[in-house]
């Protein structure tokens, strides 16, 4: 069996967007991502990497899907549903929530304290990809009962 690579993040969600260039800017404004790299020709994004802390998402244009991207559909193509979503750990869930709402994110689950710890909320971006943001850190030591 192959071992994980010795790198910052070994699991990186990949997304496809109809207007990837606009979504890159929106994800940075609304969620606080930072551009790591963007390979584009005109409006067509071949590949982009956005970072948040030590995590990353990769994305590209639906019009340039290639063999791998053809297996990935837009949420609106399947009734607005997702088969998976990114969960992002933030230090201040309330401040992040306010930032996302101000940028026009659609709130799916309002911000609340979670029974397993932390505070969080779920939202959709303008192209209906679902995101979870919260302060619960699954890597932290469990609280003593």
Predicted regions located by residue number:
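C-terminal catalytic core of tyrosine-transesterase DNA break-rejoin enzymes
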Residues: 127
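Short, surface-exposed ligand-recognition loops at beta-strand->loop->(often short) alpha-helix junctions
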Residues: 16-19
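Vicinal oxygen chelate
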Residues: 1-14, 24-124, 135-145
């Amino acid at each position: 069996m192959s071992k994980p690579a010795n790198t910052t993040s070994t699991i990186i969600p990949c997304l496809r967007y109809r207007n990837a260039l606009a979504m890159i800017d929106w994800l940075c404004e609304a969620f606080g991502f930072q551009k790591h790299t963007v390979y584009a020709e005109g409006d067509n994004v071949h590949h982009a990497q956005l970072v948040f802390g030590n995590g990353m998402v990769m994305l590209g244009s639906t019009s340039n899907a290639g063999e791998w991207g053809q297996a990935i559909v837009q949420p609106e193509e399947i009734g607005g549903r997702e088969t998976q979503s990114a969960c992002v750990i933030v230090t201040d869930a309330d401040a992040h929530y306010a930032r996302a709402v101000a940028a026009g994110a659609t709130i799916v689950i309002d911000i609340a304290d979670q029974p397993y710890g932390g505070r969080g909320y779920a939202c959709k971006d303008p192209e209906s990809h679902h995101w979870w943001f919260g302060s619960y850190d699954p890597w932290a030591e469990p609280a003593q009962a």
